Amino acid sequence: YKGKYMKGWEDVRNARFKKQLELGLFERPDQLTPRNPKVPEWDSLTQEEKERYDMQMAIYAAVIEEVDRSIGRVVEHLKEKGVLDNTLIILLSDNGGNGEPGIEGRFAGKNPGSAGSTVFLGAAWADVANAPFFLYKHHGHEGGCNTPFIVSYPNGIDKSLNGTIQKDNYGHIVDIMPTLVKLTGATYPSSRGGHKVCLLYTSPSPRDGL
């Protein structure tokens, strides 16, 4: 991935949103929020700074690829065991991209990206990771709390919903436990937080608001 991000965070963010529009994740071009004013323009950086930030994002991209590969290994194992269709797999993030501790993020260690090193995206690349939303982790804006919730459950989700994007159903992480209780038929105290996510066992019912 080294060199892929030398075009800068503005161009990468715009390109990602264009792809999101093509995929149907969003419908209107005006849904792309303004760039974080605290983030410097890419062209204002020195060549050394650009190379450093490019490597920072390249390392992050490589980590995401490894996560994807690892999930694939789990899925293949479940297929081999013949239990994939009756297995519920949930993939989500607890918050938006990590803008800590500021624009520069963290890029520590003799060989950033290796074991023992510390690499954080920083606010500039977190702004890209959360496109088209504004801000990132720690903030109440959508960039901090509106994250994907990806579910695979072949025997439990209507096949007509395969590959679809449910944009009108909102949930919270506390909703996962009551959903699992419903699906497994487990017995738990009736007094608990969260609500059952209806998509997993009945017809979707959009919320009026968030």
Where are these regions (language model features)?
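Active-site-proximal cap/lid insertion segments
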Residues: 1-171, 177, 183-196
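Single conserved hydrophobic/aromatic residue that forms the stacking wall/gate
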Residues: 201-210
